[in-house]
UniProtKB/Swiss-Prot annotation:
Glycyl lysine isopeptide (Lys-Gly) (interchain with G-Cter in ubiquitin) crosslink site(s): K128
Residue positions, PTM N,N,N-trimethylalanine: A2
Species in which this protein is naturally found: Arabidopsis thaliana (Mouse-ear cress)
Protein name: Histone H2B.9
PTM annotation (N6-acetyllysine): residues: K7, K12, K20, K21
Length: 132
């Protein structure tokens, strides 16, 4: 029996780029390359939710549906905080939302113990940011 030749994986030829010929006044044509459509990036908190989950419970996973719910929850909370801090700035006739408005909004929107922890973590984050 003759030895079999080695098979190499089939190489794909590069796909031709989308080109369009446009006729000029002098009868010549010019090739114009079309730009590819870029994917619109949607910002989510999924990676951050996952990081926090692994810090709290390293052995537990989360389903895609639950991750979507958590992402919606965080968006809702941030929306409420933004509305409340905006309202506070308007009440005080201030053109800028500062950390003080955010802190007050957190105290108004979040309940009891959760607000205390959020304020302390926020203060810690602002201190770390300003010191660096």
């Amino acid at each position: 029996m003759a030895p079999k030749a080695e098979k190499k994986p089939a190489e794909k030829a590069p796909a031709p780029k989308a080109e369009k010929k446009i006729a000029k006044e002098g009868g010549t044509s010019e090739i114009v390359k079309k730009k590819k459509k870029t994917k619109k990036s949607t910002e989510t908190y999924k990676i951050y939710i996952f990081k926090v989950l692994k810090q709290v419970h390293p052995d537990i996973g989360i389903s895609g549906k639950a991750m979507g719910i958590m992402n919606s929850f965080i968006n809702d909370i941030f929306e409420k905080l933004a509305q409340e801090s905006s309202r506070l700035a308007r009440y005080n006739k201030k053109p800028t939302i500062t950390s003080r408005e955010i802190q007050t909004a957190v105290r108004l929107v979040l309940p009891g113990e959760l607000a205390k922890h959020a304020v302390s973590e926020g203060t810690k984050a602002v201190t770390k940011f300003t010191s660096s």
